[in-house]
C-alpha cells in the first residue's frame, strides 16, 4: 500500500475528537501519528485511532476529498465513519 494517495480519519476514542488528513503513504503516516511524531493537533489531543480511510488514484483527488470532508459538519463525518465502521474499530491492523 506504499505511495497511494489516501484520505483518513483518526479519532481519540469512540465518538471522540476527529482529525482528517491526506497522505501519499497511509501506513507510514498513521504510524507517525500513533507514535506522536507529528507535532500538532493529533499529538496534543491524543487522536491516534484510524477509524476511516479511502484510497484514491490521484493525489489531487485525495486533496480535494480531504478539503470536502473538512467542511462537513461533525454528524456527517460520524455518519461516514459508521457507514463502513459502525463500531469504530481500530483499522490500523488491516493495513499492516
Please tell me what each predicted stretch does:
Residues 1-39, 43-55, 60-67, 80, ...:
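GIY-YIG nuclease catalytic motif and its immediate N-terminal context
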Residues 72-73:
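A common structural junction motif
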Amino acid at each position: 500500500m506504499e505511495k497511494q494517495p489516501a484520505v483518513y480519519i483518526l479519532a481519540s476514542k469512540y465518538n471522540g475528537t476527529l482529525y482528517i488528513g491526506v497522505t501519499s503513504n497511509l501506513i507510514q503516516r498513521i504510524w507517525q501519528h500513533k507514535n506522536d511524531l507529528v507535532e500538532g493537533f493529533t499529538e496534543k489531543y491524543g487522536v491516534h485511532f484510524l477509524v476511516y480511510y479511502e484510497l484514491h488514484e490521484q493525489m489531487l483527488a485525495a486533496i480535494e476529498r480531504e478539503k470536502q470532508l473538512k467542511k462537513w459538519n461533525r454528524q456527517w463525518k460520524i455518519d461516514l465513519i459508521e457507514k463502513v465502521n459502525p463500531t469504530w474499530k481500530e483499522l490500523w491492523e488491516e493495513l499492516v
